[in-house]
């Protein structure tokens, strides 16, 4: 069953999702980010993590890179090959 879910790019199990959600929430608090939308998919050892953060309009690219590096450092501790994509937007409709 879990192999079929992975092939269909379904959400991974709770034991995979929980540490990712915790890492995203920690980074969100640390950097004062707004709402976010998190998408996860798992295929074998590869874990695809996509996060969209809502940020203030004056947010700068240098800050975005710092957030990405910090989040990746946390996720690399997981027993998966993490493929991370982090997006930033000032439009709150993208954070839903």
What spans do the regions from the language model cover?
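Alpha-helical transmembrane segments and adjacent TM-loop junctions that form the membrane-embedded core
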Residues: 1-96
